[in-house]
């Protein structure tokens, strides 16, 4: 790590400790040239797979897009924001766990439906109706029947 004071390349770590929930490391460093001390924070960079859309276009994973879609389905439903965030984190973990560099958007949609089914059945039906392009009332009825099984 370069010294922020003199830009020297040689620095040493004096102290390291975990911060908060252990997802971050705080390091106290000292420059070996100018002897100034400074603090750095390290966080693991978790790379998400790229999303392959149905038209084969590839784009980076967009957590905000995932959140917006789930919140739209959950609109005016009694689900806490903590539960929504936990579901989003679970989906992100599932995506990373695939070990793939690219993942079809259809698979992400299936992960979202799994989580919505656990959170709120009405939100699940709302999302499924758009995601699976329900044509008529019969499609809704079939999906509701699956939920009741």
Swiss-Prot record:
A zinc finger (unnamed) spans 3-34. It holds the Pfam family Zn_ribbon_NrdR. Residues 49-139 form the ATP-cone domain. Signal peptide: none annotated. InterPro entries: ATP-cone_dom, NrdR-like_N, RNR_NrdR-like. Binds 1 zinc ion. The keyword Repeat does not apply. One of its GO terms (molecular function) is zinc ion binding. Its cofactor is Zn(2+). Disulfide bonds: none annotated. One of its GO terms (biological process) is negative regulation of DNA-templated transcription. Keywords: ATP-binding, DNA-binding, Metal-binding, Nucleotide-binding, Repressor, Transcription, Transcription regulation, Zinc, Zinc-finger. Negatively regulates transcription of bacterial ribonucleotide reductase nrd genes and operons by binding to NrdR-boxes. NCBIfam families: transcriptional regulator NrdR. Belongs to the NrdR family. HAMAP family: NrdR (MF_00440). This is Transcriptional repressor NrdR. It comes from Proteus mirabilis (strain HI4320). The gene is nrdR.
